[in-house]
A protein has these predicted regions:
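Predominantly soluble domains enriched in secretory-pathway, periplasmic, or organellar proteins
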Residues: 9-341
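Bacterial N-terminal signal peptides that target proteins for export
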Residues: 1-6
C-alpha cells in the first residue's frame, strides 16, 4: 500500500512540476507556423511548422493537442496539422482529400474528433485525429467559412460568406436543418452562452445580425465598425466583442441592450505595418482573431498588420500589453496549463 501511495505522490508532484502555466497558441498565416506564447512573461517559447495559409486552430479538451486548419494560399489547402503541445512539435498532417479550403474548426466533446468546414467542397467534415483520417462528411451545399459548435457537440452553425447566409447543421443526423440569408458577407459568428442566440458579423454590410439559434429567425440588426470580421461573447453572456478590420477597432456590445457601448483602439505605426492577405487598410492595424479567457477577465486581439497581439483588460477595456507573434497572426487557442516539454 505504501509503495502505491509513494508512486501516486511522485506522479502528482511530477505533473505539478511539469506545469508551465497559461499560454496561447497563435497561427501566423503568412509564414505557415504556430507560435506558443507564455502568458507569464509574453515570451514566444516555441514555433512549429504547419501547412500553407493556416487560419483557425482548436485546442483539445485536455490541453495537450492543437489542430490547425490549413486553408492554403493561391493553391487550395486540404490538410490539418496536429501539434503536440507537450513536445512542441508538429506530429502529423491529416490529408482531407477532396475536402479543400478547411477553415473553421472545433474539437468535439469526445476529445478525439474535430469538426471542420470545407469551404470549397461545401461540407462539414468530421475528422478522427488519433487515426489521422476523415471519419465522415456532411454535404451542406454551402461554402462554410467559420463555425460555432454547440456546447453538447450535436450541432454546428456555419457562416457562408460567398452566399450571404448561415446554416444550422445537425451532426447527430448528418443533415442541414436550415440555411437563411442574412446579408452579403457573414463571417464571424458565435452563439450566446445560454444557447439561444446566434450572432453573425456581416463584413460587407457592417452589421451584426442576431438570430434565434434554433430557428434562425432574425431578431435584430446591430451596426458595427467597418469590415467586422469576428464576433465573440464573454463567458457571462453580458458583452460581445466584434473586431473591425478596416476601422481598426473592436466594438464592445451590450448583449441585452444590443448596442455598442465602447470601442477598443490600438497603437498603429505605419513604419512597422505590413501588407496582409487583405491588403492595406489605411491606418488600421487590422484586428482579426479574438480570443477571450475562460474567466472573462482578458481578451487577446490578433493585429494582423502589426504582427502582434493586444492583451485587453475587459474590466477597463484598455490594452495592457502587446505580444510579438509571427507574420500575420489570426486564429488563436488558449491553454490553461501548458505542460513543460
Amino acid at each position: 500500500m505504501r509503495t502505491h501511495i509513494v508512486a501516486l505522490l511522485i506522479a502528482l508532484t511530477g505533473s505539478i512540476a511539469a506545469a508551465q502555466g497559461p499560454a496561447l497558441v497563435v497561427l501566423n498565416k503568412a509564414e505557415a507556423s504556430a507560435s506558443i506564447i507564455s502568458l507569464a512573461d509574453g515570451r514566444t517559447i516555441a514555433t512549429m511548422p504547419v501547412g500553407d495559409g493556416p487560419h483557425e486552430i482548436a485546442i483539445s479538451p485536455d490541453g495537450q493537442w492543437a489542430v490547425a486548419a490549413n486553408y492554403g494560399g493561391r493553391t487550395p489547402g486540404n490538410s490539418l496539422t496536429v501539434l503536440d503541445l507537450r513536445t512542441r512539435r508538429a506530429v502529423r498532417a491529416i490529408d482531407l482529400g477532396t475536402y479543400t479550403r478547411p477553415h473553421g474548426i472545433a474539437w468535439l466533446p469526445d476529445g478525439k474528433r474535430v469538426v471542420v468546414t470545407s469551404e470549397q467542397a461545401g461540407a462539414v467534415v468530421i475528422v478522427d485525429v488519433p487515426n489521422g483520417r476523415v471519419d465522415h462528411a456532411i454535404a451542406t451545399g454551402q461554402p462554410g467559412h467559420l463555425l460555432t459548435l454547440a456546447k453538447d457537440g450535436r450541432h454546428v452553425w456555419t457562416a457562408n460568406i460567398a452566399t450571404g447566409s448561415v446554416s444550422l447543421v445537425d451532426l447527430d443526423h448528418g443533415k442541414v436543418v436550415k440555411t437563411v440569408v442574412t446579408g452579403r458577407g457573414p463571417e464571424g459568428n458565435d452563439v450566446s452562452p445560454n444557447g439561444r442566440e446566434l450572432w453573425a458579423a456581416d463584413r460587407t454590410l457592417n452589421r451584426i445580425t442576431v438570430l434565434d439559434a434554433n430557428t434562425l429567425d432574425s431578431l435584430a440588426s446591430i451596426p458595427t465598425g467597418e469590415f467586422p470580421n469576428r464576433v465573440h461573447f464573454t463567458p457571462d453572456g453580458r458583452w460581445v466583442l466584434v473586431s473591425n478590420i478596416r476601422s481598426g477597432t473592436v466594438d464592445v456590445i451590450d448583449a441585452a441592450a444590443r448596442r455598442a457601448v465602447d470601442h477598443i483602439t490600438f497603437a498603429f505605426d505605419s513604419t512597422q505595418a505590413n501588407q496582409t492577405m487583405l491588403g492595406t487598410m489605411g491606418r488600421s492595424p487590422q484586428p482579426e482573431g479574438i480570443l477571450i479567457a475562460p474567466d472573462g477577465r482578458h481578451a487577446w486581439i490578433a493585429l494582423s498588420a502589426m504582427n502582434r497581439l493586444a492583451e485587453v483588460d475587459l474590466a477597463t477595456r484598455r490594452v495592457l500589453r502587446y505580444l510579438t507573434t509571427g507574420k500575420e497572426p489570426d486564429g488563436m487557442g488558449y491553454v490553461a496549463n501548458l505542460a513543460a516539454p
